């Protein structure tokens, strides 16, 4: 039997509001044990009657993989056949008898809109290349240095001829040189959290751990940040947790009750 990814102590900390690294256990995490390959799924839905995982690995059969409920309303399961790149959602049965198809609040990656599923992603493969930037003495004296911030919405800054957004690779080639030429020291990126509606500028999120897939995957985002740091451009992310969208797959009424609105 595969042990749960989250311990009783961590579950207790989460219930008390003190598990500050909850993202390391909640959501979808690939097993590090080569003898037991698969994915751990963990979600908080304290008022749900039942929760299962539906996705590419079970042909979206919501009856195939029911989760176990732990203390504090935490649901978890290990699915051996799940792998990196698989799309998935949680199927939540509420006390009213409704069935909700929800994205993962702790997902690291999601489908490109208008699709709404979460995607299993491994964040541990990328190696940061900005050690020199992080160790630079000026990093400790930023309050005493001139600062000129370029705020940008990556969705609307430039588009391809077909109307699609620029990728991180394209932004590396065009946005970074522009910022340097104009004398900016930092790029402030308007919210990168996943969101369904371009017009919200990213302020109506569906989750706070999933960087939007509009421009590429999380590793491509980190490569973009590395490229900024390589030329001494700092990166600031606009992050607003005060509100989120109420789309059916999002955080609103997540388990049939307002657990994220409260």
State where each predicted segment sits:
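The feature marks proteins involved in alpha-glucan
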Residues: 1-36, 40, 69-151, 156-163, ...
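Glycine-rich, histidine-containing beta strand-loop boundary motifs that form or position
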Residues: 43, 55, 79, 92, ...
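Short proline/glycine-enriched turn/loop motifs at strand-loop junctions of beta-rich domains
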Residues: 44-51
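Short beta-strand elements bearing conserved aromatic residues within extracellular beta-rich modules
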Residues: 51-53, 88
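Solvent-exposed serine/threonine-rich low-complexity stretches and specific carbohydrate-binding patches
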Residues: 62-70
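Substrate-binding/active-site clefts of carbohydrate-active enzymes
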Residues: 131-146, 153-262
